Amino acid sequence: MPLVYADSSALFAYLHPRDEFSTLVDAAVREDSPDFVYWSWLRFELRHNLRMTRTDSDGEVAWQALRAAEKTAARFRWQGELTADKMLDAAEELSGERARTIDCGSGDYLHVAAARRLNLLSGIDEFWTCDAAQAALASATGLPTRLFQLKHAPGKTAAG
């Protein structure tokens, strides 16, 4: 199975049936059958975003799917070497290299820095995101990148 670093936008779309990118991400998962990198920052960000959607049955289903995946380690591969302090330092370094040329938020830099670090340590097959700016950053650092894009103008995702 390929190992994919999917940022929280892609993982949210994988878990939440009403996310605008859900169909695209689900099709990619069916086609590639990847395992996903999972670490403390990604876990926090994904759980936080899913908690905010637990206001209806789709949000609850997404939350339960996440919890089941975490308990069984189905698809989510924990990466203990990605520690928050080390990844914050790596994101700081990456920001210093690229912030003037690639306009991304700090969380985007953290995801790309973590993916880049893991790629150097053991290799990842791809970086997945629904965020065009983050995809540009990942590509600029040499990561093989898949950007999920809608054919129509984007609306609001279930995550907000």
List each language-model region with its residue ranges.
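Short, well-structured N-terminal submotif of metal-dependent ribonuclease cores
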Residues: 1-42, 52-64, 153-160
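A general structural signal for well-ordered alpha-helical segments in protein cores
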Residues: 22, 43, 66, 88, ...
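Short, mixed-charge aromatic SLiMs
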Residues: 33-37, 67-76, 134-143
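Conserved phosphoryl-transfer catalytic core
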Residues: 46
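Helix-adjacent hinge/juxtasegments
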Residues: 52-85
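Active-site neighborhoods of divalent-metal-dependent phosphate/nucleic-acid chemistry enzymes
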Residues: 76-133
